[in-house]
Each structure stands twice: as structure tokens, then as C-alpha cells.
Regions:
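Glycine/small-residue-rich pyrophosphate-binding loop that anchors the diphosphate of NDP-sugar donors
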Residues: 28, 296-297, 322, 343-344
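N-terminal phosphate/diphosphate-binding loop that engages ATP/GTP or pyrophosphate donors
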Residues: 34-91
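Nucleotide and nucleotide-moiety/phosphate-recognizing core
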Residues: 37, 51, 61, 67-70, ...
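Phosphate-binding/switch loop-helix module in NTP-utilizing enzymes
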Residues: 85-115
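Phosphate/Mg2+-binding loops and adjacent switch elements
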Residues: 106-163
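Charged phosphate-binding loop/patch that engages nucleotide di/tri-phosphates or the phosphate backbone
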Residues: 144-167, 331, 342-368
């Protein structure tokens, strides 16, 4: 089975269609596979094509009466939520997938064989080969075969590659007024270089220089003036506002973000974070040596940033506090390897910074008189 179609198709999550003629067993296959995918920690959405139309409500119920009166209906219950739209306000397949991709790990499409989506084709008992006009078939599952095993084997090989094929950017979180440090952290010097310059170099070396973006406002070292820059959304406050700006700018991308107060971060730390990407893992937040999580030098998938914006909106002050990042679903908090652990050490006062410089011999102490 080929993996040549590894891409996201603009929907924020990997998409795979399961196609075949009526009676080929598409629903039976998905019904058996979905519990296995969920057991692996994946959030799965299915978009089903029904060419004959369907009824999903009971005639005479309040919701059905309001729908037939011309309204779009949204029903909310303790265990499920449902939306019913009429023909005039229905969503396209593309928009439906884009919306579902915000909070799911895998999007499966049953049917829609005439689309450009990558497809698994299911042979039927009497009709097997797909019509010539059906494109994007990546594999065919014969009728008399263990199709569930073949489907799961394909997903296990394809999904990690598709997940990691989504763009990965580096975001340098700029400091505010620099109350504790005396100046904004990005321009504070450490060993003859600005902290912002040190962290930006780590991001650029660990990813690609053109994928490093400045997040936030404030003065800059001259060496960073050429980097792309995103302003914080005016309706949000707090250090997470920069992540919201990043997600709105590139909603399909994952981000490794780094604050300017990590003087020990290097490309190896960024590469280690990037290597932690897994389907179903929305965020990776490393621990410092003392066990405290460090959300300001971490990895966030687009689903995580979508969830973070919802959490920040729930705050009366729209404060995107760093602690909000710890509440993102499907977040892995883990201890980095010992040889990398110092990368998550941060400095918050001029005294801490000078002590680190002196410890490493980066400054010359005046001679005693």
C-alpha cells in the first residue's frame, strides 16, 4: 500500500474516504474499525454520503416542527449534540471536513467517490473494479478478504505520516513590559547576545529559519527585524494570546512555541519536541527538573490551539493564561531526557540571569580591591 498521498488536503486533520458500490460493506467495515481506533486514543469523525436523502428527526417533535418551519436546528443534550440544516444553508463537504478537523484526529468519509479525496476502494460481491472516472484510489480491499485487518494495517502506517505532514512552525513569544527583568526579555543580554536572538536561532536551526514567526509586540533586537511577526488578538490578554494569533494565521499548522526566558534552549530541544508528534496527541508540555510543567516551551497541534481559544473565551476577562494550556485535552506532560532537561530552565530576574552568566564564566567579575 502506497503512502504517496500523505497530506491533509486543507482540512486540519488527515482525511481518508472509504468508497465502493452499494452493498460493498463500507458501513460494516467502519463500524468494526471505529472502536479499535477510539481504543487507540483517537478522536474519529465520519462523514457519510446518502444520495437518497434521509430523515433524522421524528415528525411532530418540537425540533422537527421548527426545522420544517425553516430554521436550522441545533439540539444539545447531556450526552450528544446534533445539528440539522436545510438544503439552502447546508455546508459543503469541504467546509464540513474543515469544521470537524478542528477537534478530531482522523476524518473518515463514507462514499463521495467522485471527490478528489484519497480513497480505499471496497470491492463488492458482484461488482469489483472501480469506474475509471474514480480517482485517488490508494488501495483496493477485495470482497473475500480480511478487510478489517487490512484497513487497520493501512491506518497504522498512513496516519502517523499524514499527521506529521501538517506544517510545523516555530513561534517566538515576545515579552511584555519587562517588569521583572527591567526590559522586555527579548532584548535582555545573555553572554553577549539578546535572549530573543538565542531562542530564535534554536527555533530556526531546529525547524527551518523561514518558519520562525515572532508572536506579540514590543521592541526587538536588530537581528530579528526581518522575521515575520503576528500581533496578539486585541480581545485576548495573557501569554497564550500569541498562540491564538498563530493558530488564526495558520489554522492547519502545529507550533513549537518558546518564550524568551530560556537561555539554554538549542536546536536539539526543538528537534526533540518535533519528534514527539503522534496522532491523538494534541500537545506536548515538558517538565522542568523540579517537575513543574513548562507550557511556554512546548508543542501544540492545531486541535490544541483550537481548544485553547475556546478555554480562553470561557474566561470572563478572555485571559489566555499559561495555565489554560495545561487544561487542553489530550495533552502529554512528560520529562525530557536528562541531557536535554536544562533547555527548559528559565530565568525571571536580572539576578538569576547574572548568576547563570557567572556560573558559566560569561562575565568577568571585578577584581577585589
Amino acid at each position: 500500500m502506497s503512502l504517496n498521498h500523505v497530506r491533509v488536503n486543507g482540512f486540519g486533520a488527515p482525511v481518508l474516504a472509504v468508497c465502493g458500490f452499494s452493498g460493498s460493506g463500507k458501513t460494516t467495515l467502519l463500524e468494526a474499525a471505529i472502536p479499535m481506533l477510539v481504543e487507540r486514543g483517537l478522536s474519529v469523525a465520519v462523514v457519510k454520503h446518502d444520495a437518497h436523502g434521509f430523515e433524522v428527526d421524528k415528525p411532530g417533535k418540537d425540533s422537527d416542527r421548527l426545522f420544517r418551519a425553516g430554521a436550522t436546528i441545533s439540539l444539545r443534550g447531556p450526552q450528544q449534540q446534533f445539528e440539522r440544516r436545510g438544503a439552502g444553508v447546508g455546508l459543503s463537504l469541504e467546509l464540513t471536513l474543515a469544521r470537524l478537523g478542528r477537534d478530531h484526529d482522523l476524518l473518515l468519509v463514507e462514499g463521495h467517490k467522485d471527490t478528489a479525496l484519497p480513497k480505499l476502494w471496497l470491492d463488492g460481491a458482484e461488482r469489483s473494479n472501480a469506474p475509471e472516472e474514480v480517482t485517488g484510489i490508494v488501495s483496493t480491499l477485495p470482497w473475500n478478504s480480511d478487510r478489517l485487518a487490512a484497513f487497520m494495517e493501512y491506518i497504522e502506517r498512513w496516519l502517523p505520516a499524514a499527521w506529521n505532514a501538517r506544517p510545523l512552525y516555530g513561534g517566538l513569544l515576545l515579552g511584555g513590559q519587562g517588569v521583572r527583568m527591567g526590559s522586555p526579555k527579548q532584548i535582555v543580554g545573555f553572554g553577549g547576545r539578546a535572549l530573543g536572538e538565542i531562542v530564535a536561532k534554536a527555533l530556526g536551526d531546529g525547524l527551518e529559519p523561514h518558519k520562525t514567526v515572532l508572536l506579540g509586540s514590543g521592541v526587538l533586537p536588530e537581528s530579528l527585524a526581518s522575521l515575520a511577526r503576528l500581533a496578539d488578538p486585541p480581545e485576548f490578554a495573557g501569554p497564550g494570546a500569541g498562540l491564538i494569533a498563530a493558530h488564526r494565521w495558520a489554522p492547519e499548522a502545529a507550533w513549537i512555541v518558546a518564550a524568551c526566558d530560556h537561555p539554554w534552549v538549542r536546536s536539539a530541544h526543538i528537534e526533540w519536541l518535533a519528534a514527539q508528534r503522534r496522532p491523538g496527541r494534541w500537545a506536548v508540555i515538558p517538565k522542568q527538573r523540579d517537575g513543574h510543567p513548562c507550557p511556554m516551551l512546548a508543542l501544540y497541534e492545531p486541535q490544541a490551539l483550537e481548544a485553547m481559544e475556546r478555554l480562553a473565551c470561557a474566561d470572563p476577562a478572555h485571559n489566555a493564561r499559561a495555565a489554560v494550556l495545561l487544561d487542553i485535552p489530550r495533552t502529554l506532560i512528560l520529562q525530557p531526557p536528562d541531557e536535554l532537561a536544562d533547555g527548559w530552565k528559565n530565568v525571571n530576574t536580572p539576578e538569576e540571569l547574572r548568576n547563570e552568566e557567572e556560573r558559566l564564566g560569561l562575565v568577568v567579575k571585578p577584581a577585589d580591591k
